[in-house]
Amino acid sequence: MGSNIRAQIEAQLKQRILLIDGGMGTMIQGYKLQEQDYRGERFADWHSDLKGNNDLLVLTQPQLIKEIHHAYLEAGADILETNTFNATTIAMADYDMESLSEEINFAAAKLAREAADEWTAKNPAKPRYVAGVLGPTNRTCSISPDVNDPGYRNVSFDELVEAYSESTRALIRGGSDLILIETIFDTLNAKACAFAVESVFEELGFALPVMISGTITDASGRTLSGQTTEAFYNSLRHVRPISFGLNCALGPDELRPYVEELSRISETFVSTHPNAGLPNAFGEYDLSPEEMAEHVKEWAQSGFLNLIGGCCGTTPEHIRHMAMAVEGESPRVLPEIPVACRLSGLEPLTIAKDTLFVNVGERTNVTGSARFKRLIKEELYDEALDVAREQVENGAQIIDINMDEGMLDAEACMVRFLNLCASEPEISKVPIMVDSSKWEVIEAGLKCIQGKGIVNSISLKEGKEKFVEQAKLIRRYGAAVIVMAFDEVGQADTRERKLEICTKAYRILVDEVGFPPEDVIFDPNIFAVATGIDEHNNYAVDFIEAVADIKRDLPHAMISGGVSNVSFSFRGNNYVREAIHAVFLYHCFKNGMDMGIVNAGQLEIYDNVPEKLREAVEDVVLNRRDDATERLLEIAEEYRENAVGKQEDASALEWRTWSVEKRLEHALVKGITEFIVEDTEEARLNASKPLEVIEGPLMDGMNVVGDLFGEGKMFLPQVVKSARVMKQAVAHLEPFINASKQVGSSNGKILLATVKGDVHDIGKNIVGVVLQCNNYEIIDLGVMVPCEQILKVAKEQQVDIIGLSGLITPSLDEMVHVAKEMERLGFDLPLLIGGATTSKAHTAVKIEQNYSHPVVYVNNASRAVGVCTSLLSDELRPAFVERLQADYELVRDQHNRKKPRTKPVTLEAARANKVAIDWQSYTPPAPSQPGVHVFDDFDVATLRQYIDWTPFFLTWSLVGKYPTIFEHEEVGEEAKRLFEDANEWLDRIEQEGLLKARGMCGLFPAASVGDDIEVYTDESRTQVAKVLHNLRQQTEKPKGANYCLSDYVAPKESGKKDWIGAFAVTGGVNERELADQFKAQGDDYNAIMIQAVADRLAEAFAEYLHERVRKEIWGYAADENLSNEELIREKYQGIRPAPGYPACPEHTEKGPLWELLNVEETIGMSLTSSYAMWPGASVSGWYFSHPDSRYFAIAQIQQDQVESYAKRKGWDLLEAEKWLGPNING
């Protein structure tokens, strides 16, 4: 199946330039869809906002997506992309729609398939194809989202593989002809995607053609994760795609040099689908179809293109003009690329026939470097990184990393170190050699490197079957491989055996596995000479001659080896060892040895070895004399005074002799943290005031960083590293600055915050770093920041600009709210809007009209500096704002052409569609123990059994489900340590009473009256104690009810005697005092730990108490017998909704709960003015017993319900709108 499609498409590509379609998001945006459009009927009651979930439209608006497909096909597109850019389970998690990923991918492929087939039927001479799209996800596998923890990852390779596998299967099942891995900004994500795709192909028994398309993100010409175009290509070349290309981020002008480079280096067809130019000052794409076609025609005439299409800002008209531009132009002819081993880190490394000897740094090996082993054992990873950095600075073109030591967790150490290496551009620019005798360590390492690395090593020692299995996986991971000359019989120690084993391995790898011969690197075993054992004397000669044999008989294979092994007999005399290495390598290189694992800082030059010593060494290495060993031993003593070896190359630390100002600047530019505190302190002592250090050398260094970044000479990982150094320096100076009450100068003070309800801040952090590098003072409030805090800090700190960020769709409404509050409170600051779900359209239509001062949509970090400069310049601001407002007016005019389609229902209609319960046939259970029950100083040992540990790990940003998180390759060990620490605290809490758990519950006679619930003082039901006010879902529902909590309590008129429960529990009595003690001691870890444990105890208490209520106190489920896992999954009868959460979102309803139970007086829990509970580790809510009761979400409500709710609560409309704001439609 796959081979036929590939042959068909390749035949087409050789004849003409094929057309890919254009921007799907651009076209969807043109429809001006509203929330209800995204929801459709099926998701009308979904608990979170869905607007912006474009992939969901294949289910809710399939006719619209098909209409877009037809438009592109009519314009001339040969290849349709499925509407699945964000359809992986990982990306769909933003909407809690992971379970729909497979269905969405299938439906999207099916829609595209139907459209393509219709057009193929119209003109069989122009067949149309479907490319199943796999987007990059919203996470990065090779970049930490936390600038303070470069080793942390928020997604693993295995999680990506699982997500991409599910999407791939569905895309194929839906009818895709090709798989398109596109908009790659993190190559490791793409490698995981390719791994998943190839695994699915193997599973299905056929392969489809694969297209790969990456994204160059800035002027440096690199991906977001730091790779050059060629390095990126080398990293994914193993996939053998039908096409390799670039898309998004840049317009044709900016993208041209990278397309040209790709066309030069790629053995396969080249594709590109650029944006319609760069976004202008207002965030829109200006390049017209005609202008874009001119660029495309020039590319075609220059011989760059095999496939062309469009990305952001492009439309069917752009594709139509592109089609006309390339008509009659010859497609790019595939070039003859010389066979070579093409490796990569952030930069490419090509090893060809004419390449000089490649040095592989050996010092990052715990078995070969005592210093490195000590640093890893003591977890001094910053210093261990220095070892790697020194190797690269001293000339290592590859670094070998080995963690095999009995007292180390080799797998965890390998993962941690490789993740940290990825954050150090000076190290990660070179390819990585993952070195281990344990396959699981090798595999864990391969899952951490975005470049094309080398595995060291595999062999035939355990037989052919194991050898083939490992080789296939290495190829799928995209690595080259070192093969040891070792089989079931043993290691090859003679020239003949070396060639025999290597030949056997080569034939298996190349002929059977399909491994590229240029990616096979043989290690024919370097053994020690001059050992005093005659049988060892010819070891070096055997190796040197075997090198020539292998190069002659095994085409394109390479040769490597551990060079230091040859001199092992002279350990302790480094000078002589280096002489042996120099002589040995000289003869090996002459015979064709390609690379060697060496100490890059201690390589001697053959001609620099003293003649007398060199001759004696040569006698040993070439086995020219029977007494060669004895003669070398004698001569070696003459060099004993040099036995310490050459001193460490002083040039690496030459900068330490510079002035302190220059040292600080150098440290910032290079991202060196080792000396930053001592240098900052020296600069402080030299300055008349501490602020001068920031405004002088530190800012000078950051200005250099900003300039280099702006010029494309420095890229994002380096900038982030520089920011880390700056933070450490400023942290040291802050106490002195505060003591002297100094105020510094900057280009402006900018407040950044991820809005309430959103935890995503990668983009915000990058913007902050870039602005800091351009001398803006940044106040970063972090994530989940409420409006009131943003505005309070903005006033207190007298900031010049406020910047809001958000990734998930509910953040858009929160941004509107912030703008309204800024207007209401009389702010006059510019407001910046950014984040993945934000858009110019939303900014213009929903946000800008609510605020009288500039609101600017900033779609990337590089644009932020120009925008801020314009906004804070008296000269530039008027013209900038005038253009901005004119542009937004145009956007609004376009938006208003389409009338919003909404499907609300009246409150009367919603009430008529309440939950249908036959109350006459149902007898509500009376409680066994009515009234209020208090649990003071409750037994912590009991609560421990009910803890749900998964959220505990999330508190520490460790993603994974308990207890399987302990097996997680990246976070498992850390999770175990946290778990142990938490349980140690729980032991202390039990034994010493450090925290108190208090709780209470009550069961009260109740009846529903419309949407509200009356709670009575006693069983006579004559006096109402409290009325609980509820909201009802108010969206049209062809199927299902419009839910309200009152539906689950017997109506007053039914005469049935029903009940309701209330509860409040806390695990945090004394929590604040304990945490404050630790903070005062500088122990943030235990401060956070005690709060996290208290939070888990509160949730466990809520779970325990609900179970006890069901089984004993109310007793309606006396026979219930559920495990803790089943309790966590809510497999029981009844619900316990909490005020402030989806089923009852209005927070003031906690008030009646507090009063019914007399909570504050009884157990000390209180409510703040905004109805937040105190202590923070607290839970409260209601108990409903009806077997049909279920959780649901109240989304948007209409004005009639707002008025009804206000009247029932005794509020005026203004008060109602304040508390119901998030749920009010419009």
Curated annotation (Swiss-Prot):
L-homocysteine is bound via the zinc atom. Methylcob(III)alamin binds at residues 695, 757-761, 805, 809, 861. Residues 6-326 form the Hcy-binding domain. Residues 898-1226 form the AdoMet activation domain. This is Methionine synthase. S-adenosyl-L-methionine binds at residues 948, 1136, 1191-1192. Binds 1 zinc ion per subunit. Pfam families: B12-binding, B12-binding_2, Met_synt_B12, Pterin_bind, S-methyl_trans. Residues 357-618 form the Pterin-binding domain. GO terms for molecular function: cobalamin binding; methionine synthase activity; zinc ion binding. Its cofactor is methylcob(III)alamin; Zn(2+). It is an enzyme of class 2 (transferase). Pathway: Amino-acid biosynthesis; L-methionine biosynthesis via de novo pathway; L-methionine from L-homocysteine (MetH route): step 1/1. Residues 651-745 form the B12-binding N-terminal domain. Belongs to the vitamin-B12 dependent methionine synthase family. Its EC number is 2.1.1.13. The gene is metH.
